[in-house]
Amino acid sequence: MTKRAGLPLGRAFLVLILLSAADSLFFSSFPRSALQLFSSVLFTDAAEPDSDATPGLRPQPSPRTFRPTGYQRIEVKTVDEELPEDLKVYTASTRGSSSRTFEVRNAGGRQEGFTLSVLTAGGPLPHGSWSWSGTPPEVQTTGGSQISFGWVPDTETPSLPERNLLQLKRMLRDEGLIEAVQLRAAEKGCPVAVLHNLRQLPVNFREVLHEEYESRSNPAKMYEVANSYVQQRGSDAARWSVSQSVELSLLEMHATSTTDPRGSSAVPSFLETGPQVRVAMTDAVPSGIRVYATPPAPRPVPVQSNQTEKERSPTSKRLVGMQLGLYLICKLAALFGHPTLFLNPYYTEQQLLEAVAQALGIAPPHRGDFENEGNEAQATANQHNGSADQLLAAIEIFRLGPNPYTIGHVLTLMIAYLDYESFFGASPSKPFHSWVSLAASAGNNTGFAMLDEMCDNHRGPKRRGQKHWYQTGGARKHKNRDMLPLHRQLCDALELVLNGVQQIQIDLMDELGKYKTGVEPLVDPATNSARIHTRTCRGLSPVCDYEATILAPVRALEPHEQQDSLRTKKAFNLVTGYGSGHVGQITGSIAEPFSHSWRTRWGKVVADPTAYGEIFERTLWFDDRELMAKSSGALFRQYDRIAKDSMSFGVFMNVENGLLKKDMRSKLEAYISQRKSFVEKRQQSRFAKLRKKIPENDPYALRAAIFLALNSRTFCAQPTSFLSSFRTFLTNQYHKLSQGRNLPRSQRSLMAFMRTGQVKFFQEWCSFDPLAVNALFLFRFAVSGTDPAALHDRQHTRVSRNKKTMRILNSKWTPAVLKKLMRKVNHKHMAREAKALLLRSLDPTVLSSIVTAFDFITHTQANLEVNQNAFMYHEVRAREVSRQSAAEKGSHRLHERGLVRETDDMIKRWAEHGIPGDIKRRLARGEKLPEGMSFGGIPIPNLTNWDAQLNSKWLEAYNAYLRHPYGRAALNARDPVALLVKDSRDRLQAEAEGTIFLGRIAKRVHQSKNLLRRAGRALKTFFLSLLRENERSEYAVWFGVKVDMRQVIQTCRQINSVAEVVKNDRLYDFITDGWMELVKDVVAGYTKASVRVPGFDTISAANEQLRKEGVAAATARNQGFLSIHYDYANLPEEERKKEFQRSMCMEQCEALWKLVMAFVMPNLQNPKKLKGYEKDFSGAKEIEKLNSPHHVNAFRFSLSVQIDFFDNMLDKTSKKNLKAMKFGASTWFTYAMKLAGQVNSEMGNPNLGTALYMQAAYYGNYIRKWMEQRRKSRKQAIIGVLTLGMMGLYALLNVADIVQHMEDIGGAPPVSCVTNEILGVTCAPQAIAKATTSAARVATQDFLKVGLFAGMAPYLMLPMAVVSVWNILKSEIKVLLQFEMALKHTFTRLKRWLAAPFKNWWAKRGRLKDALFRRASQTYRKTEQETKQPPRPRNLHNPSSWGDTELDSLGVPPEPFVQDFEIKYTTPVFPMSAPLIKA
């Protein structure tokens, strides 16, 4: 009797059980009975593991056998007792599947031990048990060692051997990886072979590998197959192979694209069953099981010549690339997609690891078990080390695909095999870490420390100021000198891969940090994964997939939104997949849902060999060596030197036509044998001790193998050698880029090749081969010497170091004049070069974001009506009956002084809210506050939604205009301006939350070409700039806009990626200018200005020379002019919306991009600065302070805000506009700070963004005072310069006067005179003694002495000089002025304190003088009255007759009472805040 059950693939745990009388007899014939339960696999006549079966033979289809398609799971329990007749098997499923109990009847139990093997599909088995009485015992799963939420229970710590073995077990028996590999292979149509012993694994993998090599070696055949599938063709076949499965997948893809109206494919799919499809199944197959169709037979390919590059169509290239990608999937499935092997507890981890190494070729073939290893086996292993087979097998690791997670997984396993005794021997000496643990820990540099432990690296102590792994990696040392060269090189390769993975870790954290998921780089992966699930899963589910999170889109996305959503999905899958690498000791059903989800997700990441290629490209992002050149770059010159070197033994000669696999092997064997002979001769030489010792183990053998592999035809479907073809391709690309001019070396490096868009041409040339980047990686690895990882770290350090000029330009201490000089030199030429670089480097789709990144909400003309022209609608003469109430009367009124003046006043009121006038006066004078007064007691305004309050003012103004009789009449007449006001009102009501209002000063247009007037304007501009004054404009041109921040930042990231290529060149400073040139061109072409501006010439507007000549109509207008379609009122609704956007973009897009780039680019170029601010605001206490009265009032009163956003981040045009605004500067800067907050929140600094938004109103009020102080400081600086100049002139004149005086009195030096008949008498000074100094030194000393004495002695000019120098410095170095403003009251009190002694002395002197005169007068009169005659002069030395006196012993009258105050500093408030005065 037979029972069978079927459940959907991937969800059922137990699907089918076949038991019958015949089966019972069949099982009883085995010495160890095995009951096997398959999900979709029927029993075959399979032997036990490692039984004597013929290797390589696959089971033939039989009436009771068909291919397994799902995930399989094995649980084994050995019972050393008699199996009873009522044996029961209990299975429990996960959420969503059923639990079943199956009864097994086995007549006549046996007395010996039995093994019960349970194979399940679709997921882990939380509990599986069997018993014959009572509660069935629990059986742990292999996933039971996972923990959730990063908590490790207080239990005994496992030993080093146990930890190492557990890590290896998790890599080899990764259920999620095996399941994902199987499912992906099934989706792509790869053949599935059920292997029954480990000896079949290398044979199976080598068969797939051989088919791939055969296909790659014949690119003409691949293109013939690809071209045939461009049209609809296909046929049936009776044979099954990897190459045919590739063709089948292409056929399926074509069939799904050519479906009939009913949705059925025109070509039978391999997942269908029908008369055209042969199915390897019988009637015993359960219904609903997914089965495979036999693929079509390959068509005979006629012999033809290889196609040239021009003859290959892009469609055919992409199909060839798909074919090659399918081979990679099938290879990975042949290597790891065998649950019957990797999940079988019969095999140890040692056996599984050696089987994988044998399949790749790292281990010698057909080697015995580890535990039975003898001297002969050890000798075989030693002989295999460094052999041609092992070296070519090492290259095969990098041919598994461009997925760095796949490569890293295999590299880690091979490192474990090569150093097995150190990791898993009887006495292991170092820890072993799984690949997922290394990748998950790379974000905080811990992964490199773990890798150093595995590979015996020593990076040394971290130097002061160094915080990155690559800054110490360039000088790291190898501790183990006995390590095999191949082992060392695989470690270096793994470190390079880990470098690429680490570079995206911060991006992943920033991407998920935008949604406030709570991820942190220093937190363990399991905790980060649990945080993400807890905060993003819908329905409060503890674990979910990306599609079930709030991050998944719920509507159709735009193209740029799709890229952003894909980036978020990758970040979610990677960070949550890292959780599977956190090993702990929590077991049971609580941790199982989390660990299973994380294992499954990580398995999908590793199982796709063609995914995440952009991460693997990052391993090449920092190589600044020359790649493209006229003939050969630095990398190819290094290759040529190696090829011509005598130690290469000529194996690289005559390889231009491409090598076959057998040729590679023969050349590599010849190289190994010749080097071995050379070393032996060298050692036997009599001069061996005098010469440099050559190691017996060749450190350059892998390099030779890589060069031979790259000279084959197995890369990029090239008919000749890859390296020779690639050299030709680079030469052609160089000529296309240079176009006859000298292209800088930095733009021809490998780094530039990968970052500036050249790689996309390389991919197309390479027929979209998935291994294209792998070939570049191997080439760079081979020409990087004996330590490629150290070289990579040194290059990374050199490239990442900020230029000195950039540090100077962004420094607070740099004078403004120096910044201008550094920027102005050759500015226009550098901007054009930057534009050319961006134009050839950026994806053309990026340019569309120039106009789509901004959604204009309100129109300039609408704002002109309610702001500049508001006075026209202030008083309305109408009948009183038309106004029923005061509210209606007020609704017709607009702000008489303009709207922005009202918003400025509102911001000022917020900044001074709750502060009495007496307190403000006391603070301004630095006096003490009243008793009991504190900052915490002053009320603060409610600015939670300050932008909504400001936006409501604009709405009120629009409504007032539309209610005004003129506005109503204009709207009824469909006046374009009235329609713009109405459209702006409607859009602002719908998008009020994200709208930002900004203003620009309309440029004055000077049409006169009179030379005198132009000279007068230039002279006026010079004096205004000298005084830091501007031609003030009462009103600006205002508009409302909503910024698509994600699209803007995505564009800026791509721009910055291009900019980093030229980071060490001066061009780096002009990338923003180059982008602005591109913006001008795109806006001019998109907006069609000629439609709305009569006489507008697009060509002359885009041409700088024509703009100078005044040909363009744009020079005769400014942003305040009406620029709208002449028939705007009659346009359809959709066209009117488009015209609204185009007319605004024509005027404002350029200015908006300047402002946005000023905020975003410094964040990308110098992220440490804003990360420091983010850290300051990230604490819970700092967040609470944002609404704390004490903190807010200290912030308002101290005026100690940072002005980086104004000085170092605002663009030049915005600064000029802001300084020229007579009204509206506070409003503009307040909204600009809101924009800066949005930028920082989107870029992963949410706390800083929140702080900027909450304090924006105070910033706006402060910036007005800041600009006033800057104007005053310039005037003080001018006075200081004049003072110092006069002092210097005075000293110079005194020196000249002294010299002239000496000459007049005969003190001149002696001279020697000579009489000449032609010239007459000539006299020269005569030396009377040996000179002890130079004349210049004497003159300088005299000048300084005279100046110093003149300043100190007679006039006390030294303090004047110090004050003058201070005024000049604070005028040019803005941080000094900021410091003075912040400590203004402290300086006032300090000045009073310093002046008090002099003031008191002068007061005492005055009082003494008055007392002396008064006493003398009284004495004189008294004496005169007594003697009746004028008194005689008294003796000044005998004061006894002076009478009574009120003077003290020193002759000084007593002092009046003076009230003293004590200066105390209160609790620290905002940085650099002024102290308070308390009595």
From Swiss-Prot:
Q: Where does the record locate the signal sequence feature? A: 1-24
List cystine links.
1313-1323
Q: Which residues lie on this side of the membrane: Cytoplasmic?
A: 25-1277
Presence of keyword Transmembrane = yes
Q: What is the effect of changing residue 1309 to A?
A: Impairs interaction with AMA1
Instruction: Report the protein name in the record.
Output: Rhoptry neck protein 2
Q: What does this protein do?
A: Essential rhoptry neck protein that plays an important role in host cell invasion. Upon host invasion by tachyzoites, the protein is injected into the host cell where it functions as a receptor for apical membrane antigen 1 (AMA1) on the parasite. Part of the moving junction (MJ) complex, a ringlike structure formed between the plasma membranes of the apical tip of the parasite and the target host cell. During invasion, the MJ migrates from the anterior to the posterior of the parasite, leading to internalization of the parasite into a parasitophorous vacuole (PV).
Q: Which family does it belong to?
A: Belongs to the apicomplexan parasites RON2 family.
Please classify the protein's predominant subcellular localization into one broad category.
secreted
Q: Which residues form a coiled coil?
A: none
Q: Where is this region: Disordered?
A: 49-68, 291-316, 1419-1445
Which cellular component, as a GO term, is one annotated location? extracellular region
Documented effect of changing residue 1319 to A: Impairs interaction with AMA1
Q: Which UniProt keywords apply?
A: Cytoplasm, Disulfide bond, Host cell membrane, Host membrane, Membrane, Secreted, Signal, Tachyzoite, Transmembrane, Transmembrane helix
**Effect on the protein of changing residue 1323 to A:** Impairs interaction with AMA1 and inhibits host cell invasion
Q: Where in the cell is it found?
A: Secreted; Cytoplasm; Host cell membrane
- Extracellular-side segments: 1299-1479
Give the stretches traversing the membrane.
Answer: 1278-1298
Q: Keyword Disulfide bond: yes or no?
A: yes
Q: What residue spans carry the region label Interaction with AMA1?
A: 1297-1333
